[in-house]
């Protein structure tokens, strides 16, 4: 099976903004750095954090349907190459936000304006039954962690390793990468 050049997607679209004070690339790099600091050697969790918004880089900008379904689309994009856990976390990081909004009013009040808008597009807080079903999944805690890093990874002053630091991890799952800049 041919690989997926993730770095080419970041090079082509990673410098775009998505309503926050950082670019898509910076957001992904901050998420990966947060996951790496918290999870140590859990490469699957770091990979999910790095790629949780990959679908934004693979579809035309300005499409609300992309915002609503980007978790599912991102998971489908990476699923042929990564362990099921990574794809599940990517797929459910939006549901994790919807879960937190349903169970934690403080979390909801702390969302950025862009996240509040995307929450509405994504269907709002989860219903009780859906929240309970999600919470029962064995990888639920991982999706919550990625969600929290997703919320935190919006600091325009943050210093992170460059994308090139993650190329060995990407190549382990996706094959050769063609990164031309750090």
Task: Spell out what each predicted region is.
Residues 1-182:
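Metal-dependent phosphohydrolase cores
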